[in-house]
Swiss-Prot record:
This is F-box protein At5g36730. InterPro entries: F-box-assoc_dom_typ1 (IPR006527), F-box-assoc_interact_dom (IPR017451), F-box-like_dom_sf (IPR036047), F-box_dom (IPR001810), SCF_F-box_component (IPR050796). CDD domains: F-box_AtFBW1-like. It comes from the Eukaryota.
Length: 410
């Protein structure tokens, strides 16, 4: 049987064994193979072949002191041997800028992830999209001057009868006391912006409380209160659907938080959404995971994933405005990055049941008090973007020229 006649699943299995550096040649062979290699199913197979040999390892993206790092996480055996904790979260690569002053990937204050692409927001409010796995970047020309408090999101439109995806960027300013507002959408395919107006009865407390899932973006939101500040307002999730280019209805949460409490979002396996809630009075931390999440509907697990009293462990509340976390389901733990050591160190707390609590130094000294470390999930992708310049991953203790070898080992 000819390769072109193989079932799609079998063809993906065969082509996923091709080295990463040869994928370009595969794509140029025929239209069918080119289309297939852009699909998430193929990417997962390609990535899974490498990671299957690495004992429960996975990657996350961390922003620390205005720089972006890929961190390799391996919590295998942490409960058995606490000596392994120091090496459980290790820096593997750093995003660096090469030979092009038009595209700066340093001084990055915010990063948003979708399908292996990173939307980086710089201190100077420049928008740069990069695929660190492929070493590509795209500098996005904006319509106007944006502000650090604007809300940003990266997602994709679902294309009918095609595995290809049309990626988009959403930017909007949450005017706390105005119901009539607008947002801007950048379309990668047309390289253009458009402005849409909408009416809302909610506000976003903090622009970092956001996660991309299945191409759509979810925010933690509160009901708008026009007549002044209140400490106790209805809270919920709001989704922006990049296919319809509309915000969805309010999605209920499994708890109620006050404005002084901590609420943070994270993705789980790129399929479900997790929410961390910490009461500011009791310091009790709860983590909940969805069983279904769509732009117009959500359901939650009947049992809390993790519940821990942080009062005897840390004695303080996690960051409300720039907090982040990720979970490791098989270990029943959450990992929360923080500023520690009188704001001189970037740390991560590993928190589990029965008061399991460990501290890991992330290996990047802290120089900026006001920029807490921020983590988001990361799954390598072969999504191609029209590039302006080449941005590489600087492997920890390895020269930048080793980029291709490092990509193959991700």
């Amino acid at each position: 049987m000819a390769m072109s006649n193989l079932p799609r699943d079998l063809l993906e299995e065969v082509l996923s064994r091709v080295p990463v550096k040869s994928i370009a040649a595969v794509r140029s062979t025929c239209k069918n193979w080119n289309s297939l290699t852009y699909g998430q199913s193929f990417t997962k197979k390609l990535y899974g072949k490498t990671m299957a040999t690495k004992e429960k390892e996975f990657l996350v993206v961390m922003t620390m002191d205005l720089e972006v790092y890929l961190m390799r996480v391996n919590l295998h055996g942490i409960h058995k041997d606490d000596n392994n904790v120091k090496s459980s979260i290790m820096q593997k690569a750093k995003l660096i800028r090469l030979n092009d002053d038009r595209v700066r990937v340093d001084d990055i204050c915010k990063v948003f992830h979708c399908d292996g692409l990173l939307l980086c927001i710089t201190i100077g409010i420049r928008l740069v999209v990069c695929n660190p796995y492929c070493g590509q970047t795209r500098c996005i020309k904006t319509r106007r001057d944006y502000h650090i408090t604007d809300n940003y999101a990266l997602g994709h439109e679902k294309m009918k009868n095609s595995p290809l995806r049309n990626y988009k960027i959403l930017v909007f300013h949450d005017k706390s006391f105005l119901q009539n507002s607008w947002f801007e959408i950048y379309n990668f395919n047309s390289d253009s912006w458009k402005v849409l107006y909408f009416t809302c009865d909610w506000k976003l407390p903090f622009s970092q409380l956001v996660v991309s899932l299945k191409g759509n973006t979810y925010w933690f939101a509160r009901e708008m209160y026009i007549h002044g500040p209140r400490i106790d307002l209805p809270d919920f999730l709001i989704c922006f659907d990049f296919t319809t280019e509309r915000f969805g209805p309010r999605l209920h949460l499994p708890f109620h938080s006050r404005c002084v409490d901590t609420v943070t979002l994270a993705s789980v396996r790129e399929e479900q959404l997790a929410v961390l809630f910490q009461d500011s009075k009791t310091l009790i931390l709860e983590v909940w995971i969805t069983t279904k999440i769509e732009p117009n509907a959500v359901s939650w697990s009947s049992k809390v994933f993790l519940e821990v009293n942080m009062s005897p462990l840390t004695g303080f509340q996690f960051n409300r405005s720039f907090g982040s976390f990720f979970i490791v389901e098989e270990k029943n733990v959450v990992v929360v990055p923080i500023k520690g050591g009188h704001f001189k160190r970037n740390l991560a707390y590993i928190i589990g049941k029965d008061e399991y609590f460990k501290e890991v130094d992330l290996g990047v000294p802290s120089s900026y008090i006001y920029f807490s470390p921020h983590v988001c999930s990361y799954v390598p992708s072969l999504v191609q973007i029209k590039k302006d310049a080449q941005v590489m991953l600087q492997h920890h203790n390895v020269s930048a020229e080793k980029h291709h070898e490092f990509c193959a080992s991700l």
